[in-house]
Amino acid sequence: MCDLWKYTLPNPTEPGNIVLQLEWALQHYPASPWIKLYNASNFFDSRSIPRVDLPKIADRCQAFERVIVENHPRILNPSIAEFAAMVNGTLEVAMGLETIHPTSMTLLNKEFSLRDFSDACQHLDTLGIDRRAFVLLQPPGTLPEQSVEWVLRTLEFANTNGVRHCSIIPTRAGNGSMEWLTEQKLFFSPSLGQLEDCLERAIDGFDKMIVTADLWDLEQLTGSCAVCLGSRRRRLEVMNLTQKPAAKENLDCSCMMDIKA
C-alpha cells in the first residue's frame, strides 16, 4: 500500500528518541506554518510514542499553526485530549480509512469497522480536533473498472463524517503480501489515468472537504511515459493546490491516446 511498513520498529520506542528526531528536523528543514508528525505507526500508541515524551513534543511544536499526527481509529485514549491541550495550534489526526469496499476491507485487515471510524471522527470532533483521512485507489479486492467509483464512495463516507482533508493514495506493491495478492488476481496496480480521474471528479464533488492526490513515486504507476509524466504530474500538483480542474496538455504519446480512446 504505502512504504511506511519499512520504518516500523520491532520493539517499543525508547523515551527521548522521537524528541531528538524532531529537534534535528526543526534545525535542518525550512520553517513552515504546519508540521506533520507521521511516525509509521500510531501517534497515541505509547509503544510508538512514549507518553512521557508528549509534553516535550508539544513544546517543540508551539510555533506551528497546525500539528498533524497519524493514528488508528480504535486508539481513543486520554493522551489525545491531553496532547491537543498542550499544542498551541490546531491538532489534526489523520486516519487510514482506506476504503469502504467490503471485500477490500477484509483483505486489508485494518482491524476496524466503518462504525469505529465514525465513532473516532465524532470523538475527535467533540474534542475540537480536525480529521484527515487516507483513501486507497484500487486496494486488493477492488476491480479496476470499479475502483474510481469506490474511491468516490469512500470520499463521500469521509465527508459525511466531517473529515477536513482526504488524500487519495494509489495502492502500491512491494511488501510481499501485495505480490501474493497479485498472483491470486486479487490486486491490480492502478494507473496514472485512474488517479487523474479520481481527483478530477473528487474536487468537483465536495464543497468543503479538501481532496488531494498523493504524487510520491508517481512514475511507478502504469499508463505513463517519459513524454507525458512531467506534464501530468504538474497538472495534478495544480489541482491539489487550487482544488480546481486543470486543462490537460495535448501531448503526442501512446499513453494519452489510450486515455482519449
What are these regions (language model features)?
Residues 38, 54, 63-74, 114-115, ...:
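Conserved N-terminal glycine/acidic-rich loop preference
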Residues 68, 102-110, 137-145, 182-186:
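Surface-exposed cleft-lining segments at the edges of enzyme active sites
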Residues 12-24, 49-57, 113-117, 147-155, ...:
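Well-ordered, non-membrane alpha-helical segments in soluble/globular domains
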Residues 115-177, 196-215:
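Conserved C-terminal portion of the radical SAM core fold
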Residues 41-43, 73-75, 99-101, 137-141, ...:
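Active-site-proximal loop/turn and secondary-structure-junction residues that shape catalytic pockets
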Residues 165, 171-261:
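Auxiliary Fe-S-binding modules of radical SAM enzymes
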Residues 3-21, 25, 29-48, 60-76, ...:
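Core AdoMet radical
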Residues 25-30, 55-62, 80-90, 122-128, ...:
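Acidic (Asp/Glu)-rich catalytic clusters
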